[in-house]
Amino acid sequence: MTGNEARKTFLDYFENQGHRVVRSSSLVPQADPTLLFVNAGMVQFKRVFMGEEKRDYTTATTSQKCVRAGGKHNDLENVGYTARHHTFFEMLGNFSFGDYFKERAIELAWDLLLNGYKLPEDKLSVSVFHEDDEAFSIWKDRIGLAESRIARLGEKDNFWSMGDTGPCGPCSEIYMDRGEKYGCGRPDCAPGCDCDRFMEIWNMVFMQYNRQASGELTPLPHPSIDTGMGLERICAVIQDRDTNYETDLFIPIIRGIEAASGKTYGQAPDMDVCMKVIADHSRAAAFLIGDGVLPSNEGKGYVLRRILRRAIRYGRQLGLTRPFLSRTAGTVFEVMAEPYPELKENASFITNVLENEEVRFSETLDNGLRLLSETLDGMAAKGESVIPGGVIFKLYDTYGFPVDIVRDVVREKMIGLDMEGFDAAMAEQKAKSRSVVDFSKQPEAYRNLSAKGMKTGFVGYAGLAAQATVLALVNGGSELETATAGQEIEIVTDTTPFYGASGGQMGDVGVITADGLEITVTDTIKDPTGLVIHKGQVASGTVKKGQTISLAVDEDRRRATAANHTATHLLHAALGGIVGDHVKQAGSMVSPDRMRFDFTHFSMLDRATLDRIEVFVNDRIRENRAVTISEMSMDQAMEQGATALFEEKYGDTVRVVAVDGVSKELCGGTHAQRTGDIGLFKILSEASVASGVRRIEAVTGAGAVAFVQEQMGILAEAAGMLKESPAALAARIQKLLAESRTMAKEIAGLKTSLATASMEGPKSDDAKTLNGVKVIARTVTADNPAALRDLADRLKDKLGSGVVVLGAAADGKAFLIVSVSRDLTGRFKAGDIVREAAAVVGGKGGGRPDMAQAGGPQPEHLEAAIQKACDMIGKG
């Protein structure tokens, strides 16, 4: 059975048992600031388990993409050195939200393992929480396992908690006995032993308690089930492989690494480690980039960068000196094409990101490894065993070495790392931060509403006004029964025409009214459960919970926002067609006044390309194409070629916005009815916002007209100042610049002549002899180092063999030049002489052995500095 077949067998089995098959969520958690990445199958159901959200199904099954690298759950350093640790893996799971419980969960798992995966029953054993008599009884009496095959383990092994407080419960694990050759040899070896004989393949969590702040466990009203089985592990069992890396999920990638490196897997343990690291990290990198994570120096992007750079370093150990990750990722695309077709669709973009990062790091990798090697050699000579924190930080800051790489290099050398010193050096750098909307701290009123399955019905696609009932009034996090004039207020209603900020589109503004009541709505937001929250101030009257009110959206601002949103879709299509299909949306902001569109690309767009993009968008606007909106299943949308943002969270039914013959995207925002409603599109700027990410800012409609008028006004004003027509302005400016450059050269020549004249015509007797060498040393008139250098060259040419030391003062600064003829550079080094002289004027300097310069803030000591230079020459 292949990996793809094992995944399909699991999902098909539970679908046939009445479970809803739910698509894997993005690796980027949605509205959960407590997690860096999705690291378990239950993450996308977290709010359901906590009773804060209701879904239209009570049982579900998934194959969830997971990453454990960075943060609390970090397997990065173990990858490559163990049989089963991975940064990226798939978690197969089945879930019950208050539906079935222990007995059914155990029966389903056992049936699938025996009859679906055909595992030998006599090789399976289980563990239960030592106090969970119910689970023990089910395994013994219902399943028929002998007591000797049921291990009772403690809280560390068999009790799961979501946190210090909240849902928790005992768990039961199923193990595969791999045989005595993997064991420790002890007669009491059993599940829970630290050896490799008993391999955990499935964990079932029985979520039946709520842990209070006091530590007390109280029963949950609706116990739930959360199970997880690693696809890679079950494949190793089914395919009878010693490690996960020898399954068909990894072997094709390893074969590609063998071909590129000329090494063979299985012949040398250290080379095997390298291949396993590269294979694992290639999978993680491909999926992270596919889900919108890009290499950076903070947060998720830095974890990705660590993964990539660790793979590159291990590639060097295999002799791979040229970029190789794009090739290994290509194999990942092929292996994963069936379950994750979007990965292959994004292939060109993912490989571009990989190649760009690999080239960047390769430029500094060798220098960093050299510094680390020199440090280790120096430590060995001194008998030291801890790498200084300053060195670790320099490797990180200058050479881009994550600490993981340093640890890997010294892994077998019994060398420690001064992490306190590293942390202290890191703390000196300005911490980068980014605000996150933390819906985990939403007011109790909102949690109660969402727990009841309440969602605000949005009717704003069809109209801009509606009547609704007030469900909640909140001020400062506290729920109110009423609010009066002057109070800041948040209002949740059962229905609303107001669009809540999401998907990059800003929320609507407008008014809420009733008899004697008026509320000015200044913003509208949408929380993850579907509640729409209107923020504003009571202008007059009193609003009460349960009251019927009228809501009206500001029509002009909505229309302008809709035009800008449709324009982003046209811009996206233009970028894909003109710049390349590697372009993917990396973010957006849509407001009534302007739009901002972030996209993946690795170089600046020139003026000609931006002009082509503008022409494309404006042509589509003038064609007045229809904008149609339809709802369909996710699978149907993908079949029709709709573009999805894979870092976004989508439900089973999606909304597709299509611009006739131009684009088709999954989008929940508001849009123009026809492209002609946009009016005019004008790009304001294009710039870099991160490595591999560019940003275009633009305006449409009245905003675009205002911008063009402003630019025309500036052009007319500039033309008037130069008494030229706007059409001839560029040529006139070019002429003025050419004249300016010519005059600058003339001025520089005059200054050099003035400096030369100040020497009163150097003659042979101007040079004095010091230490058997002809030396010209004096102050001259020059206002910049360039003039001083030019004069020094002339004087050295006249001397033939000798040393020239010149000094000048200008603008409160001292300048020094030392020039040594080439035949004397073995005796005198210009850089050494000028460095000593520079100290006299309070400055620094340096250069080549034959020419060096310096500057300092104390021109009053210039004569003394020149004398210092002469003294050095005299001592020679």
From Swiss-Prot:
Binds 1 zinc ion per subunit. It catalyses: tRNA(Ala) + L-alanine + ATP = L-alanyl-tRNA(Ala) + AMP + diphosphate. The keyword Cytoplasm applies. Keywords: Aminoacyl-tRNA synthetase, ATP-binding, Cytoplasm, Ligase, Metal-binding, Nucleotide-binding, Protein biosynthesis, RNA-binding, tRNA-binding, Zinc. CDD domains: AlaRS_core. Its main location: cytoplasm. Zn(2+) binds at H565, H569, C667, H671. NCBIfam families: alaS. Consists of three domains; the N-terminal catalytic domain, the editing domain and the C-terminal C-Ala domain. The editing domain removes incorrectly charged amino acids, while the C-Ala domain, along with tRNA(Ala), serves as a bridge to cooperatively bring together the editing and aminoacylation centers thus stimulating deacylation of misacylated tRNAs. One of its GO terms (biological process) is alanyl-tRNA aminoacylation. Pfam families: DHHA1, tRNA-synt_2c, tRNA_SAD. This is Alanine--tRNA ligase. The gene is alaS. It is found in: Cytoplasm.
